[in-house]
Structure formats: structure tokens, C-alpha cells
């Protein structure tokens, strides 16, 4: 969870704004209401861990891999700490590149609005992911291995679906895709390609690390793309009353 929160914070870090010659098309608004939405999403994302959710212990340790869908069985293996760490590093890179590509060099009103939209996307993706983990309560791959007994006491091992890393990475990439299309930001094709390749890399590393099943990262990617599309699509612009 701490790595996911850290990745969210990196995604929200601003890049320095510099003067521009022309006004952007339909800049997003940035108001105190946006700050409220970001704060609410961030608070909701931290609430499950604060409340010690999910409650209860594992019914099986180890669990039977035969109960898994065929597409997920091959992902059952011991946790790889190196792949786990690499997935967080790549996620931080995706978040940083999103901020750089979507904020740098813009006039103040556009920069502030884009920052607000990115922040709302990140906070509500994190909140949605954390609560879905609690509701779905799917076991991580480690609970199907010989290391299940030692891992069973960690509540986080009951929170496999959806993948928070995948959700945040694809939310960042998709929010930039939508925003750059509306505002005709420079180098859009290159940046979109890099961001989606990075997001796919994050997802692959989560499976390689045995932190998630393939269906977990697919669910996370779908969730992230949905929120990444929705927030910048409905975010009000300065031209709106």
C-alpha cells in the first residue's frame, strides 16, 4: 500500500510552468472544489488500511491452485522481491512522465487545470482500487504456494484484485491521452506510446513478481482506463459557466 500511495504522490508532483505564447484550447478549471475531491479520494484510499480491512483470516493456507481459472494458474510461484521493486520503479516513471508531458511549459491557467485533473484521476483511482480489493478479497498467488502459512497473516495478501499498480499506471496514461487530445499537446503520439508501454510493463512485472494474477492486472488496467477517461472528460473547463 505504501508503494501505491508513493506512486500517487509522484503522479501529483507538479512540473514547472513556463510562459507560453498562445492560450490553450478549453483549459480545465482549478477550484477549491477540486482540492476537496482530491482530498476525499485520498482519504477514502487510506481508510481500509486505517480500519484494518479486510477483517478475518484465510480459510486455506495453502489454497488449491486447481480452484483458479486456467489463465491464472501459471502465475502461482514464490514472490520475487526484485520484480516487485521494479514494478514500483516503473510505475513512478509512468507517473513522472505523465506529469512532465501534461504540465511542463504550459501557461498558468492550463497548468493548474491539468494538475487538478491529474490529481483527481490519481486519487479516485487509488480509492476505487483499495475498496474493490476489500470487497472482492481475492487471495494473492503466494497463498497457493508452500509459503502460504507464513503469508496468511498479512491482510494485504487478501487484496489481489484489482492490481493497484496497473490501475494507477493505466489511469495516468489514459488521462494524458484524453487531455492531450483535447488540448493538442506537443509530442502526443510519442508520449502516449511511452506511457502505455510503461503501463503494460508495470502490469507484466506485477505478475512476474507473483503479486497478482493476470486477471488482476487486466481488471486494474480496465479500472484505470475507465477513470482515466472519465475524469478529464467530465472535468469542467474555464470556458464553461
Predicted regions span which residues?
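Bacterial N-terminal signal peptides that target proteins for export
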Residues: 1-5
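Membrane-embedded catalytic cores of phosphoryl/pyrophosphoryl-handling enzymes
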Residues: 8, 145-241
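Interfacial segments of alpha-helical transmembrane regions
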Residues: 38, 104-128
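Small-polar-interrupted transmembrane alpha-helices in polytopic inner-membrane proteins
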Residues: 97-98, 120-137, 188-205
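Alpha-helical transmembrane segments of multipass membrane proteins
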Residues: 44-49, 124-129, 133, 202, ...
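N-terminal transmembrane-helix/juxtamembrane module of multi-pass inner/ER membrane proteins
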Residues: 21-97, 133-156
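Bacterial N-terminal signal peptides
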Residues: 6-14
